[in-house]
Amino acid sequence: MMTEYVLILSAYLFSIGIYGLITSRNMVRALMCLELILNAVNMNLVTFSDLFDSRQLKGDIFSIFVIAIAAAEAAIGPAIVSSIHRNRKSTRINQSNLLNK
């Protein structure tokens, strides 16, 4: 019974993240939506790991790897955005084509 609620919440988070990535024009907002997507994936991994085989921790361990990747993205992403903002004076995605310089 509780599994369905967690999966529905994960689907909502994933949908909000995808919608935000598609419609956002700001790089910071796109990074935040990417974090939402990664957290929804982590919720699915842990839920299905517990649902199908709770003795093996494959989903939990893979979730830890995804959290590590998200932490690296959260550390490197704002640095890249601030560098682009310093050079281009904008964080809008459509104005930051680096190949036109």
From Swiss-Prot:
InterPro entries for the chain: NADH_UbQ_OxRdtase_chain4L/K, NUOK/Mnh_C1-like
Keyword entries, A-Z: Chloroplast, Membrane, NAD, NADP, Plastid, Plastoquinone, Quinone, Thylakoid, Translocase, Transmembrane, Transmembrane helix, Transport
Name this polypeptide is given: NAD(P)H-quinone oxidoreductase subunit 4L, chloroplastic
UniProt function note: NDH shuttles electrons from NAD(P)H:plastoquinone, via FMN and iron-sulfur (Fe-S) centers, to quinones in the photosynthetic chain and possibly in a chloroplast respiratory chain. The immediate electron acceptor for the enzyme in this species is believed to be plastoquinone. Couples the redox reaction to proton translocation, and thus conserves the redox energy in a proton gradient.
Disulfide bonds listed in the record: none
Gene3D superfamilies given in the database record: 1.10.287.3510
Subcellular location: Plastid, Chloroplast thylakoid membrane
Membrane topology: Multi-pass membrane protein
One GO term describing the cellular component: NADH dehydrogenase complex
